[in-house]
């Protein structure tokens, strides 16, 4: 009797295959490239590649946003605090707090957003 296996919630990436995340997106001058790996009501996993100098203006996320720098260097402002992340560094941008990003050089990151069970929290 075969066991029923549910389909993967991951997309744009092969299952059961080793990958180097920073190689899954390319930095292009004057552009921000994104590649969604998972998206549902509970979590979002996206890879980003920023050309040097590219920015995301201050905004608020609907969940806790966990950034892991994969390559390059970025300046992240959360509320009035500024942090510089390099490859291997991570930071949490808390739910509801304004945050902005500016690539100080070509930069790649993985963004994981965890959404609250009750969006009104």
Language-model segment annotations:
Residues 1-42:
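A short, N-terminal "cap"/entry segment at the start of jelly-roll beta-barrel domains
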Residues 49-51, 60-76:
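Short, conserved beta-strand element in jelly-roll/cupin
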Residues 56-58, 76-77, 93, 98-104:
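Short beta-strand His + acidic residue motifs that chelate non-heme Fe in jelly-roll/DSBH
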Residues 70-71, 86-87, 105:
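A cytosolic small-molecule/anion-sensing beta-strand core signal
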Residues 73-75, 82, 98, 108:
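Structural motif
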Residues 80-95:
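Short acidic-glycine-tyrosine-enriched beta hairpin
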């Amino acid at each position: 009797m075969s066991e029923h296996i549910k389909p993967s919630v991951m997309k744009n990436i092969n299952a059961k295959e080793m990958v180097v995340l920073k190689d899954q997106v390319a930095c292009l001058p004057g552009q921000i490239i994104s590649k969604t790996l998972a998206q549902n009501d509970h979590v979002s996993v996206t890879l980003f590649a920023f050309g040097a100098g590219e920015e995301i203006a201050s905004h608020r996320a609907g969940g806790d946003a966990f950034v892991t720098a994969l390559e390059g260097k970025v300046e992240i402002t959360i509320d009035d605090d500024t942090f510089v992340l390099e490859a291997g560094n991570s930071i949490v941008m808390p739910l509801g707090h304004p945050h902005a990003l500016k690539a100080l050089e070509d930069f790649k990151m993985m963004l994981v957003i965890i959404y609250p069970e009750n969006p009104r929290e």
